[in-house]
């Protein structure tokens, strides 16, 4: 299943990593470990952030996706399940609508 991972970095730890010349190496180490399908760096509520798409086979993998960000940057991590249009079709919305209408 596809997982959307939003990582939001607090200023102080990330700034320290930048000033020490370690931010790039830390980011690369994490990205090599979790192997996202795609990653975009942006901002979220005025803070540095990253949006990643990751394939995950079961929920027990969540710690391996989140802990590196917590431990390296003291970052906030949000995990959301994402569906393709085909996933949504297989979800049976029409039947659910009939059942719960």
Predicted feature residues:
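Conserved, structured core segments of small domains
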Residues: 1-101
